[in-house]
Amino acid sequence: MPIGVPKVPFRIPGEEDAVWVDVYRLHRERLLFLGQGVDSEISNQLIGLMVYLSLEDETRDLFLFINSPGGWVVPGVAIYDTMQFVPPDVHTICMGLAASMGSFLLVGGEITKRIAFPHARVMIHQPASSFYEAQTGEFVLEAEELLKLRETLTRVYVQRTGNPLWVVSEDMERDVFMSATEAQAHGIVDFVAVENTGDFA
């Protein structure tokens, strides 16, 4: 079992020598990252961090950076429910791609605190399943569960985007890709981040 907290070298601009920074510093700054497909493992990690950080200080907001191609519905819904449950507001920031379950988590951020980077992409669609692997009886049960999940996701999109049910239902029939400004117009994000044109040299 390792002793101590793992550290990584980091060189501050303008400094000659690198300093050793512990890898959990970003978490202490309340910065969380979803940079992969949603599965049970990353879901449990993010849920644990959100609960721990909210118990530590329920007044400081959390920031969830999303760059995800999507993933499993149930672990994603668990993250969404936790975001609604914890007392701190959860800012969601889309960088790169927030597709499928990634866009669901993006829209789940505190309303007025959902941001997309200027070149980010967002994609929504209905949940999918591997019907071809199931036997007939299982197929029917799985189809019923899939319809319930689709209804849940649709209801959340309607509530959090302000779009009518028919618009969201129609959009979820197929893959709908959006730019950051289109996602803002659609109500998935509240703001598009402004590019920093400052000179860092």
Swiss-Prot record:
Gene Ontology BP terms: protein quality control for misfolded or incompletely synthesized proteins
Active-site residues from the entry: S100, H125
A Pfam entry, by short name: CLP_protease
SUPFAM superfamilies for this protein: ClpP/crotonase
| E.C. code | 3.4.21.92
GO CC, any one term:
chloroplast stroma
Supply the InterPro entries for this chain. Answer: ClpP, ClpP/crotonase-like_dom_sf, ClpP/TepA, ClpP_His_AS, ClpP_Ser_AS
Q: Where in the cell is it found?
A: Plastid, Chloroplast stroma
Q: Which GO terms describe its molecular function?
A: ATP-dependent peptidase activity; ATPase binding; serine-type endopeptidase activity
What the record says about family reads: Belongs to the peptidase S14 family.
**Stored HAMAP family:** ClpP (MF_00444)
Summary of the function given for this chain in its UniProt record: Cleaves peptides in various proteins in a process that requires ATP hydrolysis. Has a chymotrypsin-like activity. Plays a major role in the degradation of misfolded proteins.
What name goes with this protein? ATP-dependent Clp protease proteolytic subunit
